[in-house]
């Protein structure tokens, strides 16, 4: 049986996300669940990989923000 240590939920457009930090007899892990259009997808990240996972997500967000910033630049007249 899993014990939920911390959890957050959010709604983005038509998708519902549940982010939970859990623990069971095999260890601690992050569980990210996406529910949309009657389908559910889940990603499990062991606690030993959380720092790497966080760094990878941060890097992708920084790259996405840089891409958005460069595409929103209006040329001078």
Predicted regions, residues:
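Positively charged, low-complexity terminal tracts
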Residues: 1-77
């Amino acid at each position: 049986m899993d014990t939920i240590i911390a959890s957050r939920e959010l709604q983005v457009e038509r998708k519902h996300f549940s982010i939970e930090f859990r623990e069971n007899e095999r260890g601690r892990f992050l569980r990210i669940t996406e529910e949309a259009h009657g389908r559910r997808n889940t990603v499990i990240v062991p606690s030993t990989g959380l720092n790497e996972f966080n760094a990878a997500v941060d890097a992708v967000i920084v790259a996405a923000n840089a891409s958005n910033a460069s595409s929103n630049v209006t040329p001078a007249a």
